[in-house]
């Protein structure tokens, strides 16, 4: 199934009040209170010499078109000195024994009977694909060279074939599923513990911070051919594989920029009242060598560049900067390896008016990418 990486959100947009707040940082202490109505003070708050003292969020209004209500995500990084280097993609289906071992772990995770005949065949590009498919229950496992997917029928409906639409819907408004609601069969905290435990059993290193989505009766099906009265209530966790405490890029990577096809770089683990119902493993990589260790720019420099750009080039449509995130981006080279470099990614929303017989406002989810060492912007085609 094709993964849709570019998300268009349809929401009514309103600017958020910019009253001063206090921010709690990773060690549990409180960062200095900042006058959040003052853009210059916001920049100063992001120019901390110690990366662990950065606030978790900043707010201000820049002008009548541009506001900031931004998370500051440094993930598990502990220093402004960050490595770059080369990595090689792990081939899940290259070694038959390792492939079967992974299949057994996935079968155990979603409680499938693995004592069946496993089919294998070659894809068009020559890579081996291993399939376990129960035609009666419609549960399945598929292991390809660059990814693996295990899903029960209920999990496939809840996560893939619904309005949540992890893969299908270009208008998937995932934010409405980011709630504090607790489902009856398990608390969100217990569900997260199970997700973290499962990632460890699969030997996948992920950042401590996860994204949780709660799917309930609002998560209706988007395909009429599926006939069911009720969707199972489901917790869905997006977990971010990392290297040196920094996740692989979470933005929809551009093939013209990176040299390889778009991929979503998050591990998806979903669970309903029966247990884990959906498990999607993204491409993973082995670190081959370190080519550079350098000091990255502070987020204040990146935010300043982004604000200057948005003020200069964007003349219509309200804009809200929502996140500044330190991530690793991969660039394909000629030797079946990838150059991996630290980047700052700025995520923002922009309102766009769609005119016609029934005009409406469309909220676009956009992003810009900057070299974390130099501040040079990578041009996204």
Identify the function of each model-found stretch:
Residues 1-24:
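Sec-dependent N-terminal signal peptides of Gram-positive bacterial secreted proteins and lipoproteins
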Residues 18-258:
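Preferential activation on post-signal-peptide N-terminal prodomains/segments
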Residues 65, 81-92, 287-304, 318, ...:
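Short, exposed beta-strand "edge-strand" segments with a Pro/Gly-rich flavor and a Y/T-containing core
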